[in-house]
Amino acid sequence: VSEISLDDPVIEQRYYLSKYMLASVSRDPEYPPNILGISTFDRPAWNGNYKINYNHQSPYLNLMVSGHFQQSDPHDAPYLKLMEISDEMCKRLLHHEGLYYPLGLGPHGLVSEALLLHMKSPAIHGALNMIYRYGITEDEAYAQKVYPYLRGVADFWEKDLVCRDGVYHVVGDGMHERTDGNIRDNGVPENPVNTLGYLKTF
C-alpha cells in the first residue's frame, strides 16, 4: 500500500523518508511522539505534549492511508488513558455526561496542560482518526478497544448540542483557541465549520 513511483526522484525520496521518520518515532503504543516529533529540548515548546486540536491527529492520517497501522495506533493512547478524567471534567465544568478533553495531554492519563480555550472539539477530532482506522481495516478487535471512547464522545455531543427551533447548534466551541478576552469582545462562538464537519462524519 505504501509503495509509490513518482517522476520526481526528490519528492519520491522525501515520501519514503517521511514514512521512515514517522515509523521510527511511533512504535511504542503507550508513548506516541509529541508535538515536536523527533526534536527534544530541555524546555520544549508547547510543553512538548500532545496538542489534540489537530497537531496530534494529522501525522497519523499519513500512516493509516499507507497501511502502517501498527505505527498509527499509538495515536489513541493519550485519549484512551484520559477517559476517566475527561468524564469528570465534563460533569464538573459542563454538568452533563460525556468526554470533555483539555487541549494538552501527556502520557498515561496525565493532563499536562489544562487549557480548554473555549474548544469542545478535540475529543471528536481524535475520534475521527479512530473511525478512519476502523473504516480502512474493519478490525473488530480495534473497534472493541476504542468503542468506549467513541461512545463517550457521542454521549458528550448528545448532551451538549443546543436545540433551537428544531435545529441543533454547537455553542461555546471555537474553531481555534479563544481567550476569555476574545470571548468578551466577540461573543460566544457558535457552529464552527470544523466541528460541524466532524459531527457529520462522526
Predicted region positions:
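Long, well-ordered core segments of solenoidal/helical folds
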Residues: M21-S26, A77-C90, Y149-R164
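The feature captures the catalytic groove of carbohydrate-active enzymes
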Residues: N34, T40-N49, H96-A143, P148, ...
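Alpha-helical support elements that line or immediately flank enzyme active sites
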Residues: M21-S24, H56-Q70, K120, I124-D139
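Structural recognition of the beta-strand scaffold that forms the well-ordered cores
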Residues: L22, L61-N62, Q70-P74, L80, ...
